[in-house]
Amino acid sequence: MAKHGKRYLEAAKKVDSTKFYSVDEAMKLAKETSYANFDATIEVAYNLNVDPKQADQQIRGALVLPNGTGKSKKVVVFAEGPQADQAKEAGADEVGSDDLVEKVQNGYLDFDVVIATPMMMAKVGRLGRILGPKGLMPNPKTGTVTMDVAKAVENQKAGQVEYRVDKQGLIHAPIGKASFDAEKLAQNFDALRDVILRARPASTKGQYVKSVAVSATFGPGIHLDPLNLD
């Protein structure tokens, strides 16, 4: 078991590990237990009763948080013609086609999000070994393969987050920064909660959400009642 430092242990004393906190309480406590010397990310972790091996239980999607994430993203777009112009006007950091493919092949990775038009995916596919392991391959489920590249860029710049269940049935997603008001964190939490609850597979039996916890970067987990997430 990993040893925790003094600052973590001091933060953990503020959390009662035997109780469930309300959303409002959890957001306030996540801020209070943030001890990093930077503006820590507040993250939520869902443990779901799903089997990701089943195609209909591979929960994945994206949403624009009402109050953003507090992080500015560098967005690159693979597009040509009118879509390339629209992406530039929407604020994309880099837009290109074969030239951008070559640039990435030569080591350019200074970006957080990749968006592509459907026609460009054959070219982007050549970058699979580079982008795939970093989770940067565009995907229609997250709105990053689209003809409406301008809207996709705007969503990313506005604070879109992606959520995806992993092999253990867990979803981790950021809902803001420790500098956010607790109320804004709660609004972001609610928005993510709603899409995850709506994504419940029809084939899932019994309790869908097994556990939910929020925490600041390096901070202790703060548990909420999985049966009462209001």
From Swiss-Prot:
Molecular function terms from GO: rRNA binding; structural constituent of ribosome; tRNA binding
GO biological process, one term: regulation of translation
GO cellular component, one term: large ribosomal subunit
UniProt entry tagged with the keyword Transcription regulation: no
Annotated keywords: Repressor, Ribonucleoprotein, Ribosomal protein, RNA-binding, rRNA-binding, Translation regulation, tRNA-binding
Pfam families according to UniProt: Ribosomal_L1 (PF00687)
PROSITE patterns linked to this entry: RIBOSOMAL_L1 (PS01199)
Subunit structure: Part of the 50S ribosomal subunit.
Family membership: Belongs to the universal ribosomal protein uL1 family.
Function summary: Binds directly to 23S rRNA. The L1 stalk is quite mobile in the ribosome, and is involved in E site tRNA release.
Protein name: Large ribosomal subunit protein uL1
Organism: Lactobacillus johnsonii (strain CNCM I-12250 / La1 / NCC 533)
